[in-house]
């Protein structure tokens, strides 16, 4: 029978004890995206949105989300993060729809990984862009959010293959 790591002997939720794990450098990279119309693309690119600089605000939201992941995900350990970066790149190949790709990188030196922090950062970044531009068009599409890679820890490294 499989033993669940987040359930105690009484069948109730618990946070995994990581006190015996080795301290290692851990990094995770996550991806999300948001597809917008041409008006929103131009507003973001030209920094003319009435709510302010969309990308700067979304970057800050992503950083804050990574730092606060343990308050959102019940069994996630609070971690001393050593680095958080949010990077944007436009895909203009399907104009008049434009996809903003979001890549987040989170690092720590600790006993557990930062995959959830990277995924939370990517999600919050996309949600913030939606929030700041929804007055223009509510039809935006937040795309797939997934882990691109992780390094460090007992389970080793992971690199998403293009066919995954």
Curated annotation (Swiss-Prot):
Species of the source: Staphylococcus aureus (strain NCTC 8325 / PS 47)
Reactions catalysed, as given in the entry: (8S)-3',8-cyclo-7,8-dihydroguanosine 5'-triphosphate = cyclic pyranopterin phosphate + diphosphate
Binding site for substrate: 75-77, 116-117
This protein's encoding gene: moaC
Subunit structure: Homohexamer; trimer of dimers.
Range of residues in the leader sequence: none
SUPFAM superfamilies: Molybdenum cofactor biosynthesis protein C, MoaC (SSF55040)
Active site feature: 131
GO MF terms, alphabetically ordered: cyclic pyranopterin monophosphate synthase activity
Name this polypeptide is given: Cyclic pyranopterin monophosphate synthase
UniProt keywords, alphabetically: Lyase, Molybdenum cofactor biosynthesis
